[in-house]
Every structure is written in C-alpha cells, then in structure tokens.
Design a protein with these regions (language model features):
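P-loop NTP-binding core
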Residues: 1-272
Length: 272
C-alpha cells in the first residue's frame, strides 16, 4: 500500500474546499479505501466542520511540537476506513510560527513519510489562499485538486493558482500533478453562476464532470456537524455527487499513476 497524497487548494475563501475534502474522504472510505483526512489549515476547518471545539482534539501540532506519536493523535472515526488527523491545539498568536515551520522545514514531509504506507488515500485540506502552508502541502503531494467557486473572483484567480503549481513543479516537486479543476457551489438557478461554470469548462482542461452544486443540504450538514451523506433520509443528488467525484478521481489516478452495490437510503449517523 502506498497512498495517493492529494492537496485540496483554492486561491480564495468560501469555495467549499473543506466541504469537498471532508465529503470526498467519506466517499473514498465507503468505497473501501483506507483514507486519512489531514487538516493543515491553521483555522482547523475540519474540526469546525464536524461541530467540535477546536481545542478538543490533539493533532498535528502536538505531533510536531511535543513529539506525540501519530498513532495517539490520529482519530479513528465511526466509519470504517476513515481516519482524521486534526490540526491540533494552537493559539491564534502561534499561527505565523506554524506557517513558517511548515514552509521552512521538513516536518510535513517527514510526517507523510510515516503515513504513506498505511493508507490508500491521504487528503490534505489546506487553508484558503496560496501562502506558505499551501505551498508546503504542494511540495509534498503527488496530486492537487483546485476548487473553483462558480463566481467571477474565483475565475480570475485560476492563473495565479496554476502559476503556483507550475513553480512548485519546477523548483521543489517535479512529480506533482494537477488532478483537476473542481467547479464548486454551482447555482443552476443563477444565470451568472451557470455562465461562469460553462466558461470554466470551455476554458480549461481537466475540469471534473462531477461539480458540486450550491445547496441548502450542505448548510444543514454543516449545522449538524456531519458529512452530507450522514444526514439520513433518501439518498439525494448531493450525496451521490461525491461518490461520482471519487470515482472520477480514482479513474484519473489510475491514468496518471497506473495504479489503483449503492444504498438508496440511510439512517442519520454521527461521524465522531
């Protein structure tokens, strides 16, 4: 076993990047792939998404600063094959030091080296923007997924994001590959959103077919602190979307690497 390490990145906030990483991790795990969701965001976005106080979990910070073994800070969820490495406990005044440490040292690559043979998939949720933590994640990843909200500012930021990927490929990580561009929060009832979505598809190669829609269901899941497929009730298009995206990513990984029965209704569940 050697994990596919995928960074989820976006040049701006509010693109649904963390929601995508979380729900994709669930989709991969439900397909039988042992998956680690690794929260690199100094804001601890994964913890907030799961409705937990960000001081409740030990995580990556405790491992790199206090030498707590990884097996003691990785959370095994109630879903088979899904594990979470949270950001850990960090005061706001320590964010800059955390960012510099990841950017200027090998702590992230050393951590991933310890994990790569234990999982099929390692998903890195990075902070919004193209700063030091995102760059450090790309330095150590095999693949990147770029989240693009279907709105004008995200569209204008694509060139900056692709330029960063190219720079990392040339200077630090020649093995890094762009897995694809993922349109997010596409509003089918909004002509401007639909127009931007079509512009993304027509203007760039590698756009995933399984875009994520703007939906109140994601707000409901966020309020309850669960992935969207854990809400219960009939299996909705939003729930199916991430399974489709996971299959699409698997196919692209197979193409790039040469590697690697659906239920209709669920009861509401908890992940942690």
């Amino acid at each position: 076993m050697s994990a596919s390490i995928i960074s989820f990145i976006s040049a701006k906030g509010g693109t649904g990047k963390t929601t995508t990483a979380l729900n994709l991790a669930v989709a991969f795990a439900e397909k039988g792939l042992k998956t680690l969701l690794f929260d690199l965001d100094p804001m601890g976005s994964i913890g907030f998404s799961l409705a937990r106080n960000d001081r409740e979990w030990e995580g990556f910070v405790e491992h790199i600063l206090k030498k707590v073994p990884l097996e003691e800070v990785i959370i095994q969820t109630k879903l088979d094959n899904l594990y979470i490495l949270s950001r850990g406990r960090m005061a706001p005044v320590d964010v800059c030091s955390y960012e510099r440490l990841l950017f200027s040292s090998k702590v992230l690559s050393n951590t991933l080296y310890q994990l790569i043979n234990d999982y099929d998939m390692i998903l890195l949720d990075t902070p919004s923007g193209l700063g030091m933590v995102t760059t450090a994640a790309l330095d150590t990843s095999g693949f990147a997924v770029v989240a693009l909200q279907a709105e004008p500012l995200s569209l204008r930021s694509v060139s900056q994001t692709l330029a960063l990927l190219e720079r990392v490929q040339k200077t630090k990580n020649p093995n890094l590959k762009l897995l694809g561009l993922l349109p997010t929060m596409v509003d089918g009832g909004n002509p401007a959103s639909k127009s931007i979505y079509h512009t993304i598809v027509q203007s760039f190669e590698g756009v995933f077919e399984a875009y994520t829609p703007r939906s109140a269901l994601f707000l409901d899941a966020s309020e309850k602190g669960v992935p969207v497929s854990f809400l219960g009730g009939p299996r909705t298009p939003e729930m199916k979307r991430f399974s489709m995206l996971a299959s699409e990513i698997e196919a692209r990984l197979e193409e790039l690497k040469g590697t690697t029965g659906v239920q209709n209704e669920y009861s509401q569940r908890s992940l942690i």
